[in-house]
Amino acid sequence: MSALPSSEHPPVVCLLGPTASGKTAAALALAQQAPVEIISLDSALVYREMDIGTAKPTREELASVPHHLIDIIDPTDSYSAAQFVTDAERLIAEIRSRGHQPLIVGGTMLYYKALTQGLNDLPQADPAVRAKLDELAAERGWPALHAMLAEVDPVTAARLAPNDAQRIQRALEIHRLSGQPMSELLARQADGRTFTGAADQRYRVIALEPSDRAVLHARIAARYDAMLAGGFIEEVERLRRRGDLHPGLPSIRCVGYRQVWEYLDGDTDYATMRERGIVATRQLCKRQITWLRSTPERLSVDCVAPDYVQQVARLAGM
């Protein structure tokens, strides 16, 4: 049987939420109610050999329902929002052709925005420019490059942490390639873009948001401790032994991995590494919640409520 035209399909359910908000549990519960296939919306889960620190679903969970865009690239490679859009659109069509329902699950809000609102026209990544910026960062540190960014693009610099290496590098790269601040380029593109509301009709967005952020913070600390007890440091040691990975790669910049890498370099002690890993995860959580709350089409569920899974199921309508 051929797939129905897109307009005849129900909206694609997108289950979005910050780290430790219970997305996996809710998604697996939905899979018990309907023939779904999960499309991961997570920039860290794409990497092979990075299981513990990314809180990747267990083998049993992965086997219980089809998952996509997990374990698809090597840690030496990178994966972009553009690649996600291409892969997600292909997967949505393939899943529907099998008579199943696609369920997008994750917390990489940039990927969701690219899928539903389109990609921007910023310059493509330039390996030579990035290599030069990596050299500068190695010499001076990322806070120094953050200061450089503040001189040429204060708007972008103001919303980035001084150690947000990946985003600082991208903003400086765009400025070097275009001669213009990234914030101005994005503002001009937003001014010239009109949205028809089609995204609202094609996607049903369920957002897991905490009524009490302290509960989520406690979960984050407990989960990070569980990762450390479960072999996270040994996982990073195995990655280091490969010999082809370094802290400048997007994979090793993932929250948690960067902090453990620094610990294994001897730059910090265990207690400092643990604290920095928890703080970095909480900062990621804060950014994710900010993104979610700027998404007007979302249907909000309190992820610390005892019946949040049941609420998600009702809103999903599967």
UniProtKB/Swiss-Prot annotation:
Which coenzyme or cofactor does it need? Mg(2+)
Assigned EC number:
2.5.1.75
- Positions bound to ATP: G17, P18, T19, A20, S21, G22, K23, T24
Name the residues that bind substrate: T19, A20, S21, G22, K23, T24
Q: Does the keyword Chaperone apply?
A: no
Q: Which Gene3D superfamilies match?
A: 1.10.20.140, P-loop containing nucleotide triphosphate hydrolases
- The kind of enzyme this is, by top-level EC class, is transferase
Q: Does the keyword Aminoacyl-tRNA synthetase apply?
A: no
Region: Interaction with substrate tRNA, residue numbers: 42-45, 166-170, 253-258, 286-293
List residue numbers at the site (Interaction with substrate tRNA). T108, R130
Could you give a single Gene Ontology term from the biological process aspect?
tRNA modification
Q: Where does the sequence pass through the membrane?
A: none
Protein's UniProt name: tRNA dimethylallyltransferase
| Species the sequence originates in | Cupriavidus pinatubonensis (strain JMP 134 / LMG 1197)
Encoding gene (name): miaA
